[in-house]
Amino acid sequence: MSLRFALTPGEPAGIGPDLCLLLARSAQPHPLIAIASRTLLQERAGQLGLAIDLKDVSPAAWPERPAKAGQLYVWDTPLAAPVRPGQLDRANAAYVLETLTRAGQGCLDGHFAGMITAPVHKGVINEAGIPFSGHTEFLADLTHTAQVVMMLATRGLRVALATTHLPLREVADAISDERLTRVARILHADLRDKFGIAHPRILVCGLNPHAGEGGHLGREEIEVIEPCLERLRGEGLDLIGPLPADTLFTPKHLEHCDAVLAMYHDQGLPVLKYKGFGAAVNVTLGLPIIRTSVDHGTALDLAGSGRIDSGSLQVALETAYQMAASRC
């Protein structure tokens, strides 16, 4: 039996539904289930001029074979309000979270080998009165996972984050021995178990410019990061650093590593997105399930226009397929 995967279209007024439909033009190697409003997909297909055959499926009768080119399996999930491309509506916030819940729970229950997510709009979900900081945190709660790690990857580069969506002024206080220990262990374990890398080598960024310049530009490297890395090396983790980020992100260093651990969001991700924007994938590590996502946002201004590239979603699909194969 072929592995099944769940696909969530994210914000209904954004480009997520468009991406799902564009992918359906080509056959996939595994059954791919779009957890979405059938009405939304029908309307968006008409706006895009796409002739996609939407095939209804449900937990009572999952497909065993991949859909053909021009077909898309849909687990219908009703909207609360009609959708106009590019126009956010907080009434549909619960719909977005329902698609994620169905996909995540389906993975936990063994219905899906992994889930692939299109972008959501955090702001409109919070405006609806639902606290929401992102896919990563939502899925951690759903799966009762205490610690997860956000990693983005493109060809030749993987970057994981010690901290994610924090104001910059709060980052230094968040870099603790406990946090770094958990993040490094998760990164090491998932590179081995989900990516099939037997002995992962990880480069670790310092927090401060020049990795603190021997304590003259900050002491986090001396007091927190270096002692933590040294102790983890004693557990068998191959950790290089802390290194100055502007030195670490050079070919000399990157060609000899499997992943980079950056201390904060905008330390590591600008480099990765410059290298591979449109062909990068967001992976949530530490979960008991496989979850990958695109590397871009909802692009409300492009929804329904046909002027989008589905490359990142295709990479997210391929990465999920590869990760699932590594676990089999």
UniProtKB/Swiss-Prot annotation:
EC number: 1.1.1.262
SUPFAM superfamilies: Isocitrate/Isopropylmalate dehydrogenase-like
Entry keyword set: Cobalt, Cytoplasm, Magnesium, Metal-binding, NAD, NADP, Oxidoreductase, Pyridoxine biosynthesis, Zinc
Subcellular location, record wording: Cytoplasm
Residues bound to a divalent metal cation: 165, 210, 265
Main location group: cytoplasm
GO molecular function, one term: cobalt ion binding
A cellular component term, taken from the record's GO annotations: cytoplasm
Positions of substrate binding: 135-136, 273, 282, 291
Enzyme class: oxidoreductase
Pathway the protein contributes to: Cofactor biosynthesis; pyridoxine 5'-phosphate biosynthesis; pyridoxine 5'-phosphate from D-erythrose 4-phosphate: step 4/5
Assembly behavior: Homodimer.
Biological role: Catalyzes the NAD(P)-dependent oxidation of 4-(phosphooxy)-L-threonine (HTP) into 2-amino-3-oxo-4-(phosphooxy)butyric acid which spontaneously decarboxylates to form 3-amino-2-oxopropyl phosphate (AHAP).
Entry-linked HAMAP family: PdxA (MF_00536)
Leftover remarks: The active site is located at the dimer interface.
Protein name: 4-hydroxythreonine-4-phosphate dehydrogenase
